Amino acid sequence: MVIIRLARGGSKKRPFYNIVATDSRSRRDGRFIERVGFYNPVATKGESLRIAQDRLTYWQGVGAQLSPTVQRLVKEAQKAQPAA
């Protein structure tokens, strides 16, 4: 089963997450199928969240599940998008 979840990057105490479509059996930071976006929780200026909505819609259309954290981030991105 394909799942869309966060893969951690960055250095110690400076997290950076890629939003990736991956097989549910692969490790958190392991092999993935496609990078769909990113989330930078420590960003002070600039964008902290970017999601390719078209690719996210595609993966959901073929049966991919979202992790709870990615669901929360997608809702946050959709709220911010109409304001922009």
Swiss-Prot record:
Keywords of this entry: Ribonucleoprotein, Ribosomal protein
Disulfide bonds, paired cysteine numbers: none
Gene Ontology annotations of biological process type: translation
Gene Ontology terms: cellular component: cytoplasm; small ribosomal subunit
Any Pfam family: Ribosomal_S16
Molecular function as annotated in GO: structural constituent of ribosome
HAMAP family documented for this protein: Ribosomal_bS16 (MF_00385)
Family membership: Belongs to the bacterial ribosomal protein bS16 family.
Protein name from the UniProt record: Small ribosomal subunit protein bS16
Species in which this protein is naturally found: Paraburkholderia phymatum (strain DSM 17167 / CIP 108236 / LMG 21445 / STM815)
Gene designation per UniProt: rpsP
